[in-house]
């Protein structure tokens, strides 16, 4: 295999182009309620994750790493009563906010019970599942830095 050599790119006197700023975007309560209903009526996918990414209308302009803001992706996740996700782990960080119902998560063997309005996180690279052990629909908003890692091509799932 031939040796790869770095190259010099002369940028003398050049400035970076001004960033394209995004307009504010809002997702209303009624939109969340409609999406929770839609997701809860779907059959359970193979990975046990009914979810919708919440992305800014201009996010596609950045290519990989869709989010509501560059580097941040809110996700709406729904579990029906008695359901649980399959185990997963990744190097992105997540903050979970229960917006409807209750349940628990198992994170690296530790149980985290939660109910509506509870906020919790767990370290990256820890295997976890979410469980709805209640008799009503569970909905969580999860905020993740996965888009930032995807843009850097270092997101591991």
Task: Map each language-model feature to its residues.
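Residues in well-ordered beta-strands of folded domains
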Residues: 54-57, 75-77, 96, 141
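A short beta-to-alpha transition loop/helix N-cap that caps and shapes the active-site region
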Residues: 148-153
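A short beta-strand-loop-beta hairpin characteristic of the jelly-roll/cupin
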Residues: 84-116, 126
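A short, N-terminal "cap"/entry segment at the start of jelly-roll beta-barrel domains
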Residues: 1-71, 156-157
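Short amphipathic alpha-helical segments
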Residues: 134-135, 154-155
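Conserved metal-binding segment of the jelly-roll/cupin
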Residues: 80, 107, 113-134, 140-145
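A short beta-loop-beta micro-motif enriched in histidine and acidic residues
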Residues: 61-73, 80-95
């Amino acid at each position: 295999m031939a040796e790869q050599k770095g190259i010099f790119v002369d940028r003398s006197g050049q400035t970076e182009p001004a960033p394209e700023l995004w307009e504010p975007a809002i997702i209303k309560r009624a939109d969340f309620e409609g999406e929770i209903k839609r997701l809860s009526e779907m059959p359970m996918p193979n990975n046990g994750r009914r979810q919708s990414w919440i992305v800014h209308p201009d996010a596609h302009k950045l290519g990989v790493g869709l989010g509501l803001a560059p580097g941040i992706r809110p996700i709406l996740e729904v579990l029906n009563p008695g359901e649980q996700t399959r185990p997963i782990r990744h190097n992105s960080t997540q903050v979970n906010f229960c917006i409807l119902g209750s349940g628990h998560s198992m994170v690296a063997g530790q149980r985290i019970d939660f109910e509506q309005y509870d906020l919790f996180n767990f370290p990256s690279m820890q295997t976890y599942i979410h469980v709805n052990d209640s008799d009503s629909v569970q909905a969580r908003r999860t905020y993740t830095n996965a888009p930032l890692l995807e843009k850097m091509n270092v997101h591991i799932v």
